[in-house]
Amino acid sequence: MAYKHILIAVDLSPESKVLVEKAVSMARPYNAKISLIHVDVNYSDLYTGLIDVNLGDMQKRISKETHHALTELSTNAGYPITETLSGSGDLGQVLVDAIKKYDMDLVVCGHHQDFWSKLMSSARQLINTVHVDMLIVPLRDEEE
């Protein structure tokens, strides 16, 4: 099956390059579009009123770092990137919204194979939320 628009969900870890390479290898033969997306957690949900944290400054700094990292991934992809998206909130809902808006038909995401990922896998959440084809790529941390 030839996909027309592939969405790569990245966490901006060094392993994100593996996902981009995998998606490019699938897109190139069919001249499919590729887009990148990164979803930040909503930091205001993590902090209570008991902790004095300037969330506005923190989110601006993180947003700037996210933009830089996405731009770098896009530039080094070796293939045209149609959209570079960044969102915050519920991962599944943000992806569903992007899929509908940009008419995407495949999501490529990674799954870290460590203890915590087995307990709290975002890939598992996506399987129950996203209603297009998915490719879940097993990732190993670089130091392994």
UniProtKB/Swiss-Prot annotation:
Gene Ontology CC:
cytoplasm
Q: Which UniProt keywords apply?
A: Cytoplasm
Asked if the keyword Cytoplasm belongs to this entry, the reply reads: yes
Signal peptide span per the entry?
none
Reply yes or no: does the keyword Cytoplasm apply. Answer: yes
Q: What compartments host this protein?
A: Cytoplasm
Principal localisation: cytoplasm
The record, for Pfam families, names: Usp
Report the SUPFAM superfamilies cross-referenced here: Adenine nucleotide alpha hydrolases-like
Q: Matching InterPro entries, A to Z?
A: Rossmann-like_a/b/a_fold, Universal_stress_UspA, UspA
What's the stated role of this polypeptide?
Answer: Required for resistance to DNA-damaging agents.
Into which family does the record put it? Belongs to the universal stress protein A family.
Q: How does it assemble?
A: Homodimer.
Q: What is this protein called?
A: Universal stress protein A
